[in-house]
């Protein structure tokens, strides 16, 4: 592949973290959840950062992108859903990695996600639909590959693994 980093992008609740973790186990790659990484470097929770402002959180997220995109070991990273809001974040990963869009229909996300636990979704399902409408085109523009996650979890994991193997 010549590129060490695989970035998973998509809506909150689309399965990025679960798919990324399981795919990394199958491939022997390292795994990072970008939101957890942001919490480590900021010594704050995502919720606390958002309570200051979304831009404040996004600044830490951009720092995380710069650091994680330059990793030398084979790594899968699950991003936050809004990582695509700053093109510079995506540009970091285009240089040293591939970007896979985990595309899951909103109706499927709503079946599984606790909206109260997600800072940007606390206003309910209408907010999720609005985010989807705002971001969907960007996910498609920025991704190198797309995996539809509306079948079984194992199907989505296997698709991600297959894409990564093809790029090695």
Where are these regions (language model features)?
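NTP-dependent small-molecule kinase module
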Residues: 2-3, 18, 22, 26, ...
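Nucleotide and nucleotide-moiety/phosphate-recognizing core
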Residues: 3, 19, 26-31, 64-79, ...
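Hydrophobic anchor at the beta1->P-loop junction of P-loop NTPases
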Residues: 8
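P-loop (Walker A) phosphate-binding loop of NTP-binding proteins
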Residues: 11
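Conserved glycine(s) of the Walker
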Residues: 15
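Short glycine/serine/threonine/alanine-rich loop segments
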Residues: 29, 44, 144
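ATP-dependent small-molecule kinase phosphotransfer cores
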Residues: 36-91, 133
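A glycine- and Lys/Arg-enriched "phosphate-lid" helix/loop adjacent to the NTP-binding pocket
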Residues: 96-137
């Amino acid at each position: 592949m010549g590129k060490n980093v695989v970035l998973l992008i998509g809506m909150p609740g689309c399965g990025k973290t679960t798919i990324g973790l399981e795919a990394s186990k199958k491939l022997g790659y390292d795994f990072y959840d970008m939101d957890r990484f942001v919490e480590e470097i900021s010594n704050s929770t995502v919720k606390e950062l958002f309570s200051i402002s979304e831009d404040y959180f996004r600044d830490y997220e951009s720092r995380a992108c710069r650091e994680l995109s330059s990793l030398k070991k084979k790594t899968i990273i699950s991003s936050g859903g809004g990582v695509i809001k700053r093109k510079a974040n995506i540009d970091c990963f285009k240089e040293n990695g591939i970007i896979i869009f985990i595309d899951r229909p909103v109706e499927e996300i709503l079946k599984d996600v606790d909206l109260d636990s997600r800072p940007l979704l606390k206003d309910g399902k209408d907010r999720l639909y609005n985010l989807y409408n705002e971001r969907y085109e960007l996910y498609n523009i920025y991704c190198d590959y797309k995996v539809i996650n509306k079948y079984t979890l194992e199907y989505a994991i296997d698709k991600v693994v297959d894409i990564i193997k093809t790029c090695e």
